[in-house]
Amino acid sequence: MAETPRPAEHTSSLKIYFRLLSYVKPYVGIFLLSIVGFVIFASTQPMLAGILKYFVDGLSNPEAVLFPNVPYLRDLQLLQAVPLLIILIAAWQGLGSFLGNYFLAKVSLSLVHDLRVALFNKLLVLPNRYFDNHNSGHLISRITFNVTMVTGAATDAIKVVIREGLTVVFLFAYLLWMNWHLTLVMVAILPVIAVMVSIASKKFRKQSKKIQVAMGDVTHVASETIQGYRVVRSFGGEAYEQQRFGQASQSNTDKQLRMTKTGSLYTPMLQLVIYSAMAALMFLVLFLRGDSTAGDLVAYITAAGLLPKPIRQLSEVSSTIQKGLAGAESIFEQLDEAPEVDTGTVEKERVEGRLEVRNLSFTYPGTEREVLSDISFVAEPGQMIALVGRSGSGKSTLAALIPRFYHHDKGQILLDGVEIEHYRLRNLRRHVSQVTQHVTLFNDTVANNIAYGDLAGAPRADIEAAAADAYAKEFVDRLPKGFDTEVGENGVLLSGGQRQRLAIARALLKNAPLLILDEATSALDTESERHIQAALDHVMQGRTTLVIAHRLSTIEKADQILVMDQGRLVERGTHTELLAANGHYARLHAMGLDEPAKADIT
């Protein structure tokens, strides 16, 4: 492969890293305090080497004084001074260690929190197409796994760079002060170390990206299996899911091992280089000892012996940084995604509910086939419009365009005479309620599931009234804690009919003038279907309703039926008119339109 992109890659890495460090700005005071702690810690390393000089010299003359020219200390002999200094150095080092480790941990944990919140908040404003193109496992993995790796680069790596870097600087300064000629031998190995670090960094970065993708796959498979555990058990999919998860986990393990192998080879090679330089240095110290005292030689060798550990840790930090940079790339990629387009300025307290669609066409982003083509119709306030057609005819897509989950390419959608693009997005969605066949409930109480989002804080009386109108209160009152009963993840503790009635109660409490209804009840028992039909009749009263219709009983009551086929409106009229026309609708009716499983109208 050509190596020309390297400078750009280097610049990109620096750009990502500096952007990552920008998240530390709110904690700069705490961060500086941690740096002070690491400076204190690093300063003790040459002190420990220096104290050995006085200890060795004191063996031959314990009554010698340590500070002959300092008032009040000129009588302090080595016998008392050396033990006292060791205790003071240890206390000084402990203070530095506490300040550095505690306050950097505080910065690190705050950074984890900030990045996770930023990622989660971004998810809430991203357009639908983003979720269409990214599986949930990878999105969750970014918030959990990737963020942890990133904070390692932003804080843990800095800890090593500052603490061990300053240790190396202080030790080198001490060695130069003692014998600068010999110290140049140690300096000679630095270019070799730099080359090794550069080569290893590229490998770590590449392998880290692969590990993150593999970890996302593990999360995705586990998430899918847990969410669909009933289907897995019903269709005997245990063996298949075990195999799928095992393959994803094994792939992640293999990639982790490759990175470990790289690090395991890199560290001993680096140590060999460092200790070879140490061997040469010791030979020269013994060969060229000159007029140095035994204490001088011991102090010099000790200081030189303290160098390999921080140098090795500095070189190994490259792995942490590259892992973090790989994670940061994916995080910033999500944070840089454009949010939902919201350029509208119109806000209305309440609309009448007149819906007009003019020459509407739509193509999903990244595809070429037109899903909707030249659709036009008008729904007057309070009217019910039924959308009928085979699966894939574009009914659900049309319904998704009204609350602007997607943006149409051509034509107009007007609510009370105003193009929906001109409404502020949040205001537009306040005027629209949706009840779909895929009910979403949260792991919370019945009351909080009905009064969700903007409805939170609604009076209990209003919540109970909405539940009563949705024919839900009768079963809610039988629950252990009534409206304060937890419903489990996605309402798992409730039946399908009960979940749908809570969704209808939510729509009733919202009291929006425009209702979009996917009226699927084919999976319910007769009693549940009867209750839900009564609830739906109630929720549609006085509201403009767009129904993706499945049953004949609903269609017969519609003010207008729109028959769709391959993204086009092929027929429109009332039930009687369309039967008389003997066209698409009549054929669907003959197939048993009141039987969704046969008609496959979704």
From Swiss-Prot:
Domain ABC transporter: 355-591
Catalytic activity: ATP + H2O + lipid A-core oligosaccharideSide 1 = ADP + phosphate + lipid A-core oligosaccharideSide 2
InterPro entries linked: AAA+_ATPase, ABC1_TM_dom, ABC1_TM_sf, ABC_transporter-like_ATP-bd, ABC_transporter-like_CS, ABC_transpr_lipidA, P-loop_NTPase, Type_1_exporter
GO cellular component: plasma membrane
Protein family: Belongs to the ABC transporter superfamily. Lipid exporter (TC 3.A.1.106) family.
Oligomer and partners: Homodimer.
Function: Involved in lipopolysaccharide (LPS) biosynthesis. Translocates lipid A-core from the inner to the outer leaflet of the inner membrane. Transmembrane domains (TMD) form a pore in the inner membrane and the ATP-binding domain (NBD) is responsible for energy generation.
Domain notes from UniProt: In MsbA the ATP-binding domain (NBD) and the transmembrane domain (TMD) are fused.
Stated name of the protein: ATP-dependent lipid A-core flippase
